[in-house]
Amino acid sequence: MRVHLGGLAGAAALTGALSFVLLAAAIGTDFWYIIDTERLERTGPGAQDLLGSINRSQPEPLSSHSGLWRTCRVQSPCTPLMNPFRLENVTVSESSRQLLTMHGTFVILLPLSLILMVFGGMTGFLSFLLQAYLLLLLTGILFLFGAMVTLAGISVYIAYSAAAFREALCLLEEKALLDQVDISFGWSLALGWISFIAELLTGAAFLAAARELSLRRRQDQAI
């Protein structure tokens, strides 16, 4: 079954735009990591005493949700995370320095993927307009590379979250309280995963278009 270039162009434009919008939304929102302490705040006297000592100066709920740049409490303004690129004048432990390095890695990789998609969109438009085989091939490879950058950024974020959880676990004296805390990844991370899939499909569409154009030119030469 032959696939027309027009159909591939439409598919590439749709999936490429979807990938860009979803990744931009994921980067700009603060629901990558969610900590829900509602069950803990409603539990027995021991936890109430601990939470009471914490809440004397801050009576609002302890639940929070975090993004790539900041963390937000339910009834408090969002606070920015520590800048991972200014470590020279900061004294931190080796584990904290490793966390900051991981933080700096994914805040570079994910916006970089957006930039690659912008360049891919421009070269993709020109490649379909000019019907240039090499440009179609280059654009497909560019989108696939961008998808790998997105995957790397998301993977580093997941590893960063796990390492931060282990660090908090080591510092927490009442480890049993974590059984009453619901910790999960949020919908911002889900948008990142969907963007990664759409970016893969965009790259595949451009490579399929390059192959279709090559086959068409071979047939024309044979005639």
Swiss-Prot record:
Annotated GO CC locations? apical plasma membrane; apicolateral plasma membrane
Q: Which residues are glycosylated?
A: N55, N89
Primary location: other
Tell whether Transmembrane is among the UniProt keywords: yes
Q: Which InterPro entries does the protein's record reference?
A: PMP22/EMP/MP20/Claudin, TMEM114/TMEM235
Report the transmembrane regions from the record: 7-27, 106-126, 134-154, 189-209
The answer to whether UniProt assigns keyword Glycoprotein to this entry is yes
Where in the cell? Answer: Cell junction, Tight junction; Lateral cell membrane; Apical cell membrane
Q: How does it sit in the membrane?
A: Multi-pass membrane protein
Q: Which UniProt keywords apply?
A: Cell junction, Cell membrane, Chromosomal rearrangement, Glycoprotein, Membrane, Tight junction, Transmembrane, Transmembrane helix
Disease named in the record:
Chromosomal aberrations involving TMEM114 may be a cause of congenital and juvenile cataracts. Translocation t(16;22) (p13.3;q11.2).
Instruction: Spell out the family assignment given in the record's similarity comment.
Output: Belongs to the PMP-22/EMP/MP20 family.
The record's section on PANTHER family has: TRANSMEMBRANE PROTEIN 114, TRANSMEMBRANE PROTEIN 114/235 FAMILY MEMBER
Protein name per UniProt? Transmembrane protein 114
Organism equals: Homo sapiens (Human)
